[in-house]
C-alpha cells in the first residue's frame, strides 16, 4: 500500500512536468530547467527570456556588404611560402598575395631589396640587351596594370620573355611598394633576362616630395624606405638594344657625345640637379620637334632642370654613334606612345616615347603601351587600365575623410539657429508696428542677415565637399600646394567636373607636378644650412647667419651645336618601313612615297589584325 502511495505522486508529478514542458515549448521566450529536490523528485523551473525584436533585412557585421569585394589579406605571406628552396621568389604566390592587398614580413621585404641590389650593383651603367625583348615605360605604382603587362597577349610572361623597364616605378600611384617589390623579385628570378633602368622618381628627393615615402611608412617602416632608396642608386642608367637603339628614361645631354660618356658616369649616388646623369633622367624632346629649330639644347622650364633637346641634336647623336633611334619614357601619352619625327638619314623615328601607366592618376583616361621587338619587327601594343582596390587619397583615414560630412551637419544646425533668431526678430517687429526702427536695431538685423547668408554659403560648400569628395581630392593631388584652386568650390559641381575633363586638361593641371621639386633645407657636414632660392641658386648659411653662394650646381647655359640643315620629312606613326639598313653606314632607300607607306599599312593590318586586348602598331627593321 505504501508502495502504491509512493508511485501515485510520482506519476502525477511526471504528468504535471510533461504538461509544463509542453506549454513552455509553445512559448519561444521561455526556457525550462529541471531541479532535483531532497526526495529525488524532479521539479521544473521556468526561466523567461526577454522579448526579441523582429528585424527585417538584417545586415551582418561579419560578412562584407559588397560580397564581390574580397577581404584584404590580414596576415603577411609566410617566409617559407615566399621563398623557394633555391632562394628565388615564388612569383605566383607573391602576385596572388599582392592582388589581395596582402603585405610581406618586414625582414622579407628588406631581404628581397638586398638581393636585388646585389645583382644590380654588378651590372654596368650602360647595359647591353638583345631581342626578342619587351620594352616598358613608366608604371608609377599601378601594380594591377603592371600585372596586365605580363599577360601573353601584351608583353609576355617574364619566365620566357626578355624585359626592359625604363624607370619611374614609384610615386603617384598607391601601389608603389607592390610594384617595386614585384619587379625586384622578377630581377632575382631572371637576372639575365629582366632588366631595370633608373627613372627620375627613383631617388630620395622625389619620393619624399610625392607619395612613395608616405606609402612606405603606412605599409611598412622608414627602415624599409631607406633600404629601397639606397637600392635605387644601383639601377643602371641606359641600355643599348641590339646595338641599334639607345634606351633611357629621359633623353640626351649636351655633356654626352658618345655611348662611352654614358658608360663612364658614376651612378651610385643621388641624382644631381644638373649634369649628364640629371639629363639622362630629366630631359625631354622639344614640343616643336623639327629641323627648323637650330639650337640643340635649351633649358627645360617645364621640369625646372635639365634641357629640352631638338630634332637636330638627336639626329647628330644618332649619326655619330651609328644608332637608329632613342627609346625613352618620362612623358604621359594619350595613346600610350608617340613616334617623333623620323630621321631623314634612316627613315626611322628619331625618338620613340613609351608610357605604360594607363588612365594615369585615375584621371588622364590615356592608354598604356609597351614595345615588343622581335625578328626585326616592332609591335607597339596598347592596353587599357585594370580595376584596382580603392584607397582614400594620401592614405587618409576614415575620420579625416568624414570631416566634410560632420561639418555640413554642424553648418545646418547653425543655419537653423540663425534663421530662428531672424524669425523671432521679424515677429517682434510686427508686434511693435508703432515703434520706428532705430539705427542700432537696423544694423543688428543687417548683421544677422549677413551671418545667415554666410552660413548658407558655407553649408553649400560643405555639401559640395561631401558630394564631390573624390573629384576634389584628385584636383588637390594635381595642385602643388595640395589645395583647391581659389574660387573653384563656389562655382559648383559643374566646374569641378569640367576641371577634370579630358587628357589634355588633366595633363595641364598636373603640369606643375612634372617640375623638379625644390630642395628642402638641409645641413651639410660643417653644420651649415643649405637653402635654394626661387631661381635655383644654392646658398649656405653658417651659424653666424652669414650667407655664401654655393658652387654645387653648374651653369645651365645651353651649348651651341652645329648648324647644318636637314631636309624636313613627315613622321608616320604607323607601319614605318625601312629597307636595306646597314647599321654601320646608316643609309636608307628613300624611294618609298607616302602612298606606298599607306598601302603597306593596309596590307599589314590585314595580315595581322589587332586583338581585343591590345592595339598593334608594327615597324620593320632590316637586318
From Swiss-Prot:
The answer to whether UniProt assigns keyword Hydrolase to this entry is yes
Quick one: where's region Calmodulin-binding? 444-458
Q: Which PANTHER family match?
A: SERINE/THREONINE-PROTEIN PHOSPHATASE 2B CATALYTIC SUBUNIT 1-RELATED (PTHR45673)
**Region entry Calcineurin B binding: which residue ranges?**
390-418
Start and end residues of each stretch annotated as Interaction with PxIxIF motif in substrate: 376-385
Instruction: Locate the region Autoinhibitory segment.
Output: 459-466
Cofactors named for this entry: Fe(3+); Zn(2+)
Region: Catalytic, residue numbers: 104-389
Residue spans of biased composition, Basic and acidic residues class? 32-45
One Gene Ontology cellular component term attached to this UniProt record is: calcineurin complex
Residue span of motif SAPNY motif: 356-360
- The protein in question is named Serine/threonine-protein phosphatase 2B catalytic subunit
Biased region (Polar residues) positions are 1-22
Question: Site described as Interaction with PxVP motif in substrate, positions?
Answer: 401
The record lists Zn(2+) as bound by 168, 200, 249, 330
Q: Tell me its EC number(s), please.
A: 3.1.3.16
**Role description:** Catalytic subunit of calcineurin, a calcium-dependent, calmodulin stimulated protein phosphatase which plays an essential role in the transduction of intracellular Ca(2+)-mediated signals.
Q: What are the record keywords, sorted? A: Calmodulin-binding, Coiled coil, Hydrolase, Iron, Metal-binding, Protein phosphatase, Zinc
Activity regulation, short description: Activated by Ca(2+)-bound calmodulin following an increase in intracellular Ca(2+). At low Ca(2+) concentrations, the catalytic subunit (also known as calcineurin A) is inactive and is bound to the regulatory subunit (also known as calcineurin B) in which only two high-affinity binding sites are occupied by Ca(2+).
Amino acid at each position: 500500500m505504501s508502495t502504491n502511495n509512493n508511485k501515485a505522486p510520482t506519476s502525477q508529478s511526471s504528468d504535471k512536468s510533461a504538461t509544463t514542458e509542453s506549454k513552455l515549448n509553445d512559448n519561444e521566450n521561455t526556457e525550462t530547467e529541471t531541479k532535483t529536490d531532497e526526495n529525488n523528485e524532479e521539479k521544473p523551473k521556468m526561466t523567461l527570456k526577454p522579448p526579441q525584436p523582429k528585424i527585417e533585412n538584417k545586415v551582418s557585421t561579419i560578412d562584407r556588404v559588397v560580397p564581390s569585394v574580397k577581404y584584404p589579406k590580414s596576415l603577411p605571406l609566410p617566409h617559407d611560402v615566399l621563398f623557394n628552396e633555391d632562394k628565388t621568389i615564388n612569383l605566383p604566390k607573391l602576385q596572388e598575395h599582392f592582388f589581395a592587398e596582402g603585405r610581406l614580413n618586414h625582414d622579407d621585404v628588406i631581404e628581397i631589396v638586398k638581393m636585388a641590389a646585389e645583382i644590380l650593383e654588378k651590372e654596368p651603367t650602360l647595359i647591353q640587351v638583345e631581342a626578342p625583348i619587351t620594352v616598358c615605360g613608366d608604371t608609377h605604382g599601378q601594380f594591377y596594370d603592371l600585372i596586365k603587362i605580363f599577360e601573353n597577349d601584351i608583353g609576355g610572361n617574364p619566365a620566357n620573355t626578355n624585359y626592359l623597364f625604363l624607370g619611374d616605378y614609384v610615386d603617384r600611384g598607391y601601389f608603389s611598394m607592390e610594384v617595386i617589390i614585384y619587379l625586384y623579385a622578377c630581377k632575382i628570378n631572371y637576372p639575365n633576362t629582366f632588366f631595370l633602368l633608373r627613372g627620375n622618381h627613383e631617388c630620395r628627393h622625389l619620393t619624399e616630395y610625392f607619395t612613395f615615402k608616405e606609402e612606405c611608412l603606412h605599409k611598412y617602416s622608414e627602415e624599409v624606405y631607406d633600404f629601397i632608396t639606397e637600392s635605387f642608386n644601383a639601377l643602371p642608367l641606359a641600355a643599348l638594344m641590339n646595338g641599334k637603339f639607345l634606351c633611357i628614361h629621359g633623353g640626351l645631354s649636351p655633356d654626352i657625345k658618345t655611348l662611352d660618356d654614358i658608360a663612364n658616369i658614376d651612378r651610385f649616388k643621388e641624382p644631381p640637379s644638373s649634369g649628364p646623369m640629371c639629363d639622362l633622367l630629366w630631359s625631354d624632346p622639344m614640343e616643336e620637334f623639327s629641323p627648323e629649330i637650330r639650337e640643340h639644347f635649351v633649358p627645360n622650364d617645364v621640369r625646372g632642370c635639365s634641357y629640352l633637346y631638338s630634332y637636330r641634336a638627336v639626329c647628330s647623336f644618332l649619326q655619330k654613334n651609328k644608332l637608329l633611334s632613342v627609346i625613352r619614357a618620362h612623358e604621359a601619352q594619350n595613346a600610350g606612345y608617340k613616334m617623333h619625327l623620323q630621321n631623314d638619314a634612316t627613315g626611322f623615328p628619331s625618338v620613340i616615347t613609351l608610357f605604360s601607366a594607363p588612365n594615369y592618376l585615375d584621371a588622364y583616361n590615356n592608354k598604356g603601351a609597351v614595345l615588343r621587338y622581335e625578328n626585326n619587327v616592332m609591335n607597339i601594343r596598347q592596353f587599357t587600365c585594370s580595376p584596382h582596390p580603392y584607397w582614400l587619397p594620401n592614405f587618409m583615414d576614415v575620420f579625416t575623410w568624414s570631416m566634410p560630412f560632420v561639418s555640413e551637419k554642424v553648418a545646418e544646425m547653425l543655419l537653423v539657429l540663425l534663421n530662428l533668431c531672424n524669425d523671432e526678430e521679424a515677429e517682434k517687429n510686427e508686434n511693435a508696428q508703432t515703434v520706428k526702427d532705430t539705427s542700432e536695431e537696423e544694423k543688428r538685423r543687417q548683421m544677422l542677415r549677413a551671418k545667415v547668408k554666410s552660413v548658407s554659403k558655407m553649408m553649400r560648400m560643405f555639401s559640395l565637399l561631401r558630394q564631390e569628395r573624390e573629384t576634389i581630392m584628385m584636383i588637390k593631388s594635381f595642385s602643388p600646394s595640395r589645395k583647391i584652386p581659389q574660387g573653384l568650390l563656389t562655382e559648383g559641381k559643374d566646374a569641378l567636373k569640367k576641371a577634370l575633363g579630358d587628357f589634355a586638361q588633366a595633363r595641364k593641371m598636373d603640369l606643375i607636378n612634372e617640375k623638379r621639386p625644390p630642395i628642402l633645407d638641409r645641413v651639410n657636414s660643417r653644420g651649415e644650412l643649405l637653402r635654394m632660392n626661387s631661381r635655383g641658386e644654392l646658398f649656405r648659411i653658417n651659424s653666424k647667419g652669414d650667407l655664401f653662394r654655393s658652387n654645387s650646381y653648374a651653369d645651365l647655359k645651353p651649348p651651341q651645336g652645329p648648324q647644318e640643315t636637314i631636309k624636313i620629312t613627315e613622321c608616320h606613326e604607323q607601319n614605318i618601313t625601312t629597307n636595306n639598313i646597314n647599321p654601320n653606314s646608316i643609309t636608307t632607300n628613300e624611294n618609298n612615297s607616302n602612298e606606298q607607306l599607306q598601302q603597306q599599312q593596309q596590307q599589314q593590318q590585314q595580315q595581322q589584325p589587332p586583338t581585343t586586348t591590345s592595339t598593334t602598331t608594327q615597324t620593320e627593321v632590316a637586318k
